[in-house]
Curated annotation (Swiss-Prot):
Ribosomal protein found in the keyword field: yes
Species of the source: Anaeromyxobacter dehalogenans (strain 2CP-C)
Annotated PROSITE patterns: RIBOSOMAL_S4, S4
GO CC terms, sorted: small ribosomal subunit
A family per Pfam: Ribosomal_S4
Domain S4 RNA-binding: 98-159
Protein name, entry field: Small ribosomal subunit protein uS4
Length: 208
């Protein structure tokens, strides 16, 4: 499957937002957006004025990059959100948050969503006792996500868990750090998603 393979630090600079795509580096003064808080490229420090469409597109691109999705996956998530009851924008964010790769990241088993996606694909996790290796698998309230026994000694996982206190675990999740498992207590509410996202702009873009 195609994935963005260039420097993820450029993505944060493009969106002028620290999206924590680089793991521990994002918490240090080595973070690219701290050192160069302007878009990459020859004209990065120039001022750019976006049209209404441009503003909507930038918001969509930002959220796609934040969750590490390509257009097809993101559009599929939007279509599911639009078909569900409630506000489409909030449904979209809830869908993105409940993806298994994001839940693994939020619980602290990985430093980044990209790393969480790889861990899920490589079969390191079980959901309710069954192996699930599909990153887009949607978790539900009550689901238990746990590390397989053979994976409890994987260094990058144990190191990520050691740093979980710095990042924190959202209120809608419960982590049993010593047991290498977590529980989805409830669906995330809008106020649980603290990154600066204007989801209505995405709804307006896809509604055109």
């Amino acid at each position: 499957m195609a994935r963005y393979s260039e420097s993820v630090c450029r993505l944060c600079r493009r969106e002028n937002l620290k999206m924590y795509l680089k793991g521990d580096r994002c918490y240090t003064d080595k973070c690219a957006i701290e050192r160069r808080p302007y878009p990459p490229g020859q004209h990065g420090q120039g001022r750019t004025k976006f049209s209404e469409y441009g503003v909507q597109l930038r918001e969509k691109q930002k959220v796609k990059r934040m969750y590490g999705l390509l257009e097809a996956g993101f559009r599929h998530a939007y279509q599911n959100a639009a078909a569900a009851k409630g506000k489409t924008g909030e449904n979209l964010l809830q869908t993105l948050e409940l993806r298994l790769d994001n839940v693994v990241f939020r619980l602290g088993f990985a430093d980044t969503r990209n790393e969480a996606r790889q861990l899920v694909r490589h079969g390191h996790f079980k959901v309710n006792g069954r192996k699930v290796n599909i990153p887009s698998y949607l978790c539900r309230p009550g689901d238990k996500v746990e590390l397989k026994d053979r994976s409890k000694k994987v260094v990058r996982i144990t190191e990520a868990l050691e740093a979980v206190d710095r990042r924190g675990v959202p209120a809608w999740l419960d982590l049993d750090k010593g047991g290498f498992k977590g529980t989805v207590k409830t669906s995330p509410a809008r106020e649980d998603i603290t990154m600066p996202i204007q989801e209505q702009l995405i709804v307006e873009l896809y509604s055109k």
